[in-house]
Amino acid sequence: MKYYKNKKLIQKERGNFMKKVYFIGAGPGDPELITVKGQRIVKEADVIIYAGSLVPKEVIDCHKDGAEIYNSASMNLDEVMEVTIKAHKKGKLVARVHTGDPSIYGAIREQMDILDEYGIEYEVIPGVSSFVAAAAAIKKEFTLPDV
């Protein structure tokens, strides 16, 4: 079902949209490396869609009671967007949790294009990228003075 293609399903409700959709970078795999802002949104979210094959479940374990949790590992784009749009239509805060930083191999462009098509507001919360975490783990820096 190409839910997001049927604009008439949501256009007349557009004025009722109250919450943003958040794309959250979960960091490089260590649940403690999610940003403070990312964790706050996960805690407040009514609906969480996370890449379960890549994002440790511990990242979303702080969710509030009653939050709807979806593992997108078994979902296609249509299914993810159907959940996102329906939740947003009901005024729910949606957290779409990606591994690393959503803008690096996060495949968020196609999701953002669909949200743009319907005038749904969203925000991207960056995550700690693995290249930065790797430098920290091996105690190296990327820039050296006088080099």
Task: Tell me the role of every PLM-derived stretch.
Residues P56-K57, L77-D78, S129-A133:
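Short gly/pro/ser/thr-enriched loop/turn and capping motifs at secondary-structure boundaries
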Residues D101-V147:
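Class I SAM-dependent methyltransferase SAM-binding "motif I" and its flanking Rossmann-like core
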